[in-house]
Amino acid sequence: MTNVLNLLNEIGIEELRPPQKKVIEEGLLDKSKNFLICIPTASGKTLIGEMALLNHVLDENYNLTGKKGLFIVPLKALASEKFDEFQKKYETYGIKVGMSIGDYDTKEDLSKYNIIITTSEKLDSLMRHNIEWIKDLSLAVIDEIHLIGDNERGGTLEVILTKLKNINAQIVGLSATVGNPEEIANWLNAKLVTDEWRPVELKKGIYLENEINYINNQDSQKKSFKAVKSISRNNLTDLIVDSVNEKGSCLIFCNSKRNAVGESKKHNLTKYLSKAELNDLNSISEEILSILETPTETCKSLSECIKKGVAFHHAGLTYQHRKAVEEGFRNKVIKVICCTPTLSAGLNLPCRRAIIRDIRRYSQNGLIDIPKLEIHQCIGRAGRPGLDPYGEGIILAKNEKDVEKAFLALTGPLENIYSKLSNQKVLRVHILGLIATLEIKSTSELINFIKNTFYAHQYGNLHGVLTNVSKVVEFLEKNKFIETLDDDFTPKKNRVLELTLDNSNNLVLDSKRRMDTLTNLSFKPTNLGKRVSELYIDPLSSEIIIEGLNELKEKINDMDRSNIDQYIFYIISKATEMRPLLRVKMDEELELIQEMDKLKISDYSIENIEAFKNSKMFLDWINETPEEVILEKYGIEPGILRYKVDQARWMTYSSKEIAKLVKLNNDKIYKALLEMEFRIEYGAKEELIELLKIKNIGRVRARRLFNIGIKSKMDILKNPEKIISTFGDKVGKKILDEFGLKYGQQKLSGF
């Protein structure tokens, strides 16, 4: 303990905050104890995780122990942030900090690192490659552990935690918002530590008709009020200006990307800002326009908003645009960000006033209330330690009925978190992963693993999940991902596919036989199963790809290259990883069906028509249709396009790997997959591939170079003046710098 506290003192942390002291007193530095720590945002959760990490990787004399600690975060951006922070703090002490957030089909050598920062999905994929260093793992810190209840990602986090429990690593879970912390702590066999202390007071209130009605944190019946001066026709503008005039900043949480953009356009803060602030805003505005080779309408809208002191932030922006907005806000240049609640998922963007504009949002089932857990995550961003005297979490009410709902959202208990493990896609991916890595070799081991999950702990009765497990195992066997071996029974009888449990949760294959008499029932992964597990894709997607490529093989001799490309995109667009697909409007349907006919596609289900529309978008992308045209034609944002392109690149690579394994024996298909993987990454035709391998040259610049006769690296070296004249000094010099070539030199240094 002394070494940890002394080291913190050396890096400038002289006194721990009350929750941090409390956790130490409760035994955090006892490596045999698991912890679930539920304390407010900004109260020091990350440092608690750091203390646990230091306790494992350093001994009393600051020598490295050889043990490793994981810091698991929900977002790649957050991983990058923590990586930079931890490196600066701890490399002086010989602690090597590593980060793994890249492609799933990689076996990075992380053995030299003492602290490894990653996401749950990346960790899961690493484990499928039988990493050696896992034997040295003695601690896992899980940030935002409440995401175990997330519909999309919760199942993976639950499986990871179950694996970590099985290898007896210390587990430290961190969260600000858990409705049922006792239940999760019991499952983890963890000490639960809760605390309400915050470094900055958080005032919660409801805003209606230019008045904030504050709710007393100790007594919700006691209320205080603040009148907000009316200076515009928009009472939300009034609330923003009220904060800006007090040197505060605002996050406004909206229920959709469209509303976040629309809201940001309504506010103009220029007359409340200094000349220096306006100059800084103009600089960020110009930076936004220079990020992409050709600015899109979204770029232009964001740039214009930023000039006025306001920005929007959502998944539709590219990573570079989001980063620029975040930095501008942290540096107190951008005063307001209108965003979706995804911004609250762990990013370090505190503000003076967090405003919930909408307490309801649209879902597949219509308009629903936003969960209280999510609202509390959002308002927890309010209050910057050392910068703000207090923080405010305010819900905007439109009428008295909204006031009642807002009051319940601010004062009512948080929702419980529920396991998402019973989802069939989650089970397909993870049961195959467990069998492929030989972690699970028999029916009994599979049942024991399931018994150790949060699902089993929460529901007790496993009959529901076992029904889905049975279906998944049947699917995996039928499609040759696994083999089941049973020496006592014929393959058709009493198979693992007929899993049931008795009242004591013992496996029963029929009314007379129990699991303990069937130890010879075992699983074995096939080569296909192993590879699909390593690729980290849904086995159902693999089956779709195999079936689709075999269909293409029958048709390929009647197709030109463009049709082959589109058919491959159609196949991968049907994969589960590609959802949600582009929606098909009623007036598009007939035309799309007619185009499908030309490729001899006869299944006109809505999912297939949507997949075909997706294939058209990807074909436009690799044929160099301008990005702005694609965005308008398909009604999507730049960030969503980049995400879909990245997913398509991964599925194209996976298709190529699967095609090799199943011996498709068709050179045309394999060649198309090989070229498409690179083309889709850059969105260009084959002739530009060599130029695209050069840093600072994207598809637009590559096409401009090709059109003036610059087609290779050697052409660039021979014609540096053409590079400068085509792109100007700034961009041209960046390109030439990649070769060590300064403008005016006639040869390349060190080439």
Curated annotation (Swiss-Prot):
It catalyses: Couples ATP hydrolysis with the unwinding of duplex DNA by translocating in the 3'-5' direction; ATP + H2O = ADP + phosphate + H(+). A motif (DEAH box) lies at residues 143-146. Gene3D superfamilies: 1.10.3380.30, 5' to 3' exonuclease, C-terminal subdomain, P-loop containing nucleotide triphosphate hydrolases, Winged helix-like DNA-binding domain superfamily/Winged helix DNA-binding domain. DNA-dependent ATPase and 3'-5' DNA helicase that may be involved in repair of stalled replication forks. HAMAP family: Helicase_Hel308. PANTHER family: ATP-DEPENDENT DNA HELICASE HEL308 (PTHR47961:SF10), DNA POLYMERASE THETA, PUTATIVE (AFU_ORTHOLOGUE AFUA_1G05260)-RELATED (PTHR47961). This is ATP-dependent DNA helicase Hel308. The lineage of its organism: Archaea, Methanobacteriati, Methanobacteriota, Methanomada group, Methanococci. The gene is hel308.
